């Protein structure tokens, strides 16, 4: 019954929003209503703060003839230019396959961004939001190669996953702590003598300072990209590390979901609002809770299975887990108040041309940026989360100037840095405006 009431409240929110904004029934919609749109105002997050005024989008030139770049968009919901592209920062390299950035803009405003194909991390200085600078880039770190994901430690350094070692990208990879200048602080291998056959390709991570733990997923992105070197294949393990000395505590084989499957290609771990519970989503749409995380014998249990057959990047806000499900063309919200029994409360379908992949949340409001997987339309959207019910609705005001469609298209001929043609957006992060 609680799940039914939550879903009803979410659908009521979406219906009220759609009536206010009048989006066509043929456009994106929240399941259970005929229409979806965005509220007239953007609610600020609990605990104070203001909505972000800038959105940084890491993008790759589609035909690889010109430089990849970081785009800066007007994300101030009170601005008449909301959704406009303000400036761009070319990195002077093409075909890098711009991939993950950090999920939140760090306090020091130095952003790490991944160009996966050459195994490169780019560092951007965003202290002046409207005049960002490329500080430089680096490849290997402490012998580890092909970096993927970045999370900030309590002291401000980055803890990064690296998929492999050496120029051939051989497994296992590892974790590397890096300062804002790109210098190595410490590092450790993902090798585990207790799991000699496990394919250990560190992909993403969740840091749990209260428990002195790091949860690390293993997924071989290089296999999907056609890379050679080391062992390749589909993975099904998650590791628990001790944060204080970067030691592997356990390598966990994910169990099958009820009915089979869902355990392969572990993707993204996230810490819930209590600061101690970690859920892990897989690219095969399983959702798992890490059990016994504070102990020396952690495990994993299946708690949910998304439909669609392919899942991607989640975010957490309060008691809600928001998941991109590209194969269902949808973003889905779960109530995870009871982590062992998540309840779906809302679903926003973005249409057949959308394969939502990357999500990141505005810490000063309840807005979520959505970037496509790369095989759909080159467009980013902003989705609004109702913090009381978990209802999701499309922000209809976030659009190209003069456009009759929500979202900002990256399928354009001109950019501030030149006529370089369409670009493919991926990692995106909200940030403040000029002071």
Regions found by a protein language model. Name each.
Residues 126, 131-209, 218:
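Asp-box/WD-like beta-propeller blade repeats and closely related beta-sheet repeat scaffolds
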Residues 72-81, 123-132, 180-183, 240-247, ...:
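Short loop/turn segments immediately following beta-strands, especially the blade-tip
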Residues 366-367, 371-435:
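Blade-level signature of beta-propeller repeat domains, shared across WD40, Kelch, NHL, RCC1
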Residues 83-152:
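Blade-loop segments of beta-propeller domains
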């Amino acid at each position: 019954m609680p799940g039914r009431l939550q879903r009803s409240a979410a659908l009521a929110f979406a219906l009220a929003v759609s009536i206010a904004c009048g989006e066509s029934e043929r456009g994106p919609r929240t399941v259970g209503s005929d229409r979806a749109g965005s509220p007239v105002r953007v609610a600020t997050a609990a605990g104070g703060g203001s909505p972000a005024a800038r959105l940084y989008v890491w993008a790759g030139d589609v035909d690889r003839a010109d430089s990849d770049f970081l785009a800066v968009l007007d994300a101030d919901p009170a601005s008449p230019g909301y959704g406009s592209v303000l400036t761009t920062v070319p990195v002077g390299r093409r075909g890098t396959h711009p991939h993950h950035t950090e999920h939140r803009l760090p306090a020091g405003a130095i952003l790490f961004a991944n160009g996966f194909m050459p195994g490169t991390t780019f560092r951007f200085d965003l202290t002046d939001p409207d005049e960002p600078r490329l500080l430089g880039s680096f490849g290997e770190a402490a012998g580890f190669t092909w970096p993927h994901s970045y999370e900030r430690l309590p002291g401000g350094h980055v803890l990064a996953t690296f998929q492999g070692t050496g120029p051939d990208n051989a497994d296992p990879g590892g974790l590397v702590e890096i300062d804002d200048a790109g210098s190595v602080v410490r590092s450790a291998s993902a090798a585990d003598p207790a799991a000699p056959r496990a394919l250990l390709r560190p992909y993403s991570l969740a840091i749990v300072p209260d428990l002195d733990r790091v949860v690390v997923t293993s997924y071989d992105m290089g296999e999907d990209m056609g890379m050679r070197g080391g062992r390749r294949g589909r993975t099904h393990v998650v590791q628990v590390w001790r944060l204080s000395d970067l030691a592997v505590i356990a390598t966990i084989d994910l169990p099958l979901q009820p009915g089979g499957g869902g355990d392969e290609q572990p993707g993204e771990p996230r810490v819930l609002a209590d600061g101690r519970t970690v859920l892990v989503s897989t690219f095969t749409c399983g959702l798992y809770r890490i059990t016994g995380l504070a102990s020396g014998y952690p495990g994993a249990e299946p708690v949910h299975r998304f439909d669609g057959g392919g899942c991607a990047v989640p975010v957490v806000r309060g008691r809600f887990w928001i998941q991109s499900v590209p194969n269902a063309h949808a973003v889905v919200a779960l109530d995870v108040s009871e982590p062992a029994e998540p309840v779906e409360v809302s679903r926003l379908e973005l249409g057949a041309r959308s394969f939502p992949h990357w999500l990141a949340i505005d810490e000063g409001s309840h807005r979520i940026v959505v970037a496509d997987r790369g095989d759909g339309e080159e467009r980013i959207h902003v989705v609004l989360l109702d913090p009381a019910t978990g209802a999701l609705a499309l922000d209809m005001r976030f659009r190209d100037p003069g456009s009759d469609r929500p979202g900002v298209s990256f399928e354009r001929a001109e950019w501030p840095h030149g006529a370089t043609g369409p670009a493919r957006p991926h990692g995106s992060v909200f940030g403040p405006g000029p002071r």
